[in-house]
Amino acid sequence: MAVVERDSDYYDSSYLADYYESLWTDHAALEDIAVYWAFFKERVLLSQSRVDSKFFLLDVGTGTGRVLHSLIDKAVNDADMSLDAMQFVGMDKSPFMLEQAQRAKQLPQEVRASWFVGTATALEDIASLADPHGKANLLIFAFSGINHLHQPGEIDQFFLSARRVLLPGGLALVSVCAPLLDIEGGDSVPNPYGQVKEVKSKRLEGILYREWETGQKIEGHLFTNSLKTDVVQVSQDGSERVIERNIHNIPLTLLTRDGLRRSAAAAKLEIIEERCIRDEVIFALRAVG
């Protein structure tokens, strides 16, 4: 029986959200949590030293909550940090990803965490749902999420929206895919997400995910990565059956430091630091005024 193929925007099914969770949550190649934790703790301690010690963290494109859950785990186990005044908000455009985020871990009772469907270009909608009178002390847009903003004007809209939800002096931490930053000519780039991946589901017994690249192209400021992802059911005797095949054509924006600086400055955000880790550059931007 032929496998039915479906066009996918990558995380638009429960299986694909589970694949993401199974692949990336504890992936050894990801080194970003240490960077986010350092900025997060510094900002929280600064906030706790003030009369109004309320702290609001907004995680944009939270996915299955990898970054948010990791920071909460560290905060719970840090004697210097008080969770009483903290509020954690995770936002993603995929309800399937948020479903995974909400059930990924049992949060301690004292942790206030909320999850919302939304977009990176209308963050003020999410912030108002979470706290009508509050603004964010810290905003995180992790795992090269900004590269996925590929429609005309979307990156400018993101920065403007980020500034609206940040407190004056608040901080945004924005991850950019290093292989897609400051590209000088050429018609190909290294696949930013690696080659063939095969991973067992952490939650669904007998389910295996297998993904491979089928092509790539560069047109103007866009790099399109084409992939196929199979959802495979593995029987006890080891035989396999593909139960879902997903076809992805993922447009990613090629970015430059100068372009990011201009877009940020137009939104009254100032790049104050950048941290280079494996396959990522994390920019720290401060809300001016």
UniProtKB/Swiss-Prot annotation:
EC number: 2.1.1.-
Primary enzyme class: transferase
Catalysed reactions, semicolon-separated: (1S,4S)-4-[(4-hydroxyphenyl)methyl]-2,5-diazaspiro[bicyclo[3.2.1]octane-6,1'-cyclohexan]-4'-one + S-adenosyl-L-methionine = (1S,4S)-4-[(4-hydroxyphenyl)methyl]-2-methyl-2,5-diazaspiro[bicyclo[3.2.1]octane-6,1'-cyclohexan]-4'-one + S-adenosyl-L-homocysteine + H(+); (1S,4S)-4-[(4-methoxyphenyl)methyl]-2,5-diazaspiro[bicyclo[3.2.1]octane-6,1'-cyclohexan]-4'-one + S-adenosyl-L-methionine = (1S,4S)-4-[(4-methoxyphenyl)methyl]-2-methyl-2,5-diazaspiro[bicyclo[3.2.1]octane-6,1'-cyclohexan]-4'-one + S-adenosyl-L-homocysteine + H(+)
InterPro entries assigned to the protein according to its UniProt record, in alphabetical order: Methyltransf_25, SAM-dependent_MTases_sf
Organism: Cladobotryum sp
Intrachain S-S bonds: none
Pfam families: Methyltransf_25
CDD domains: AdoMet_MTases
Family that this chain belongs to: Belongs to the methyltransferase superfamily.
Protein name in the entry: N-methyltransferase FrzE
Pathway assignment: Secondary metabolite biosynthesis
Function: N-methyltransferase; part of the gene cluster that mediates the biosynthesis of the alkaloid (-)-FR901483, a potent immunosuppressant that shows efficacy in animal models and a probable inhibitor of purine nucleotide biosynthesis by targeting phosphoribosylpyrophosphate amidotransferase (PPAT). Within the pathway, FrzE methylates the amine at position C10'. The biosynthesis of (-)-FR901483 starts with the condensation of two L-tyrosines to yield (S,S)-dityrosyl-piperazine.
Keyword Ligase: no
